[in-house]
């Protein structure tokens, strides 16, 4: 279980993330137990549903991508990514693990969290909890150390010109 003070610390870190025009377009809707948590768990695709419901907290992440007048907010998803990263860094500092998952039913996420579709875009879910064992995660990830496999820097950073 993650207590409310710890939950508040996570969202406090996210809330200080930089954003274009200080718009702060991120919306985090979380559940820890009860019927709402069951609804949140139901949006997970099978590969995530085998482990994520064991985490003490599940967060559904949305970005404001249209303003009140219906105009696009071009940086909404980028800024929300910065807020999620701030939350992840704070979780790590607190001895918690956080894992974002794109493997969710985005349409179901709106309903589960009660978020309006006209101005917000569903992005992902985040499981937050304590490190489990290899038995708690998908066997493919254990076998391939999938979670920590990274491209070479030369594949992602280029001086002056992109190279394929």
Predicted segments with their positions:
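Acidic, surface-exposed loops and disordered segments
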Residues: 1-164
């Amino acid at each position: 279980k993650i207590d409310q003070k710890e939950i508040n610390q996570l969202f406090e870190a996210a809330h200080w993330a930089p954003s274009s025009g200080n718009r702060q377009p991120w919306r985090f809707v979380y559940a820890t137990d009860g019927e709402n948590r069951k609804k949140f768990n139901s949006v997970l695709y099978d590969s995530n549903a085998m482990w994520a419901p064991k985490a003490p907290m599940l967060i559904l992440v949305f970005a404001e991508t249209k303003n009140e007048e219906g105009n696009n907010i071009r940086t909404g998803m980028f800024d929300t990514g910065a807020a999620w990263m701030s939350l992840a860094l704070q979780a790590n500092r607190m001895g918690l693990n956080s894992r974002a998952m794109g493997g969710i039913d985005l349409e179901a996420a709106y309903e589960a969290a009660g978020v309006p579709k006209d101005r917000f875009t569903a992005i992902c879910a985040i499981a937050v909890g304590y490190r489990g064992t290899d038995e708690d995660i998908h066997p493919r990830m254990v076998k391939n150390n999938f979670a920590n496999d990274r491209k070479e820097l030369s594949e992602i950073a280029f001086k002056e010109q992109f190279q394929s």
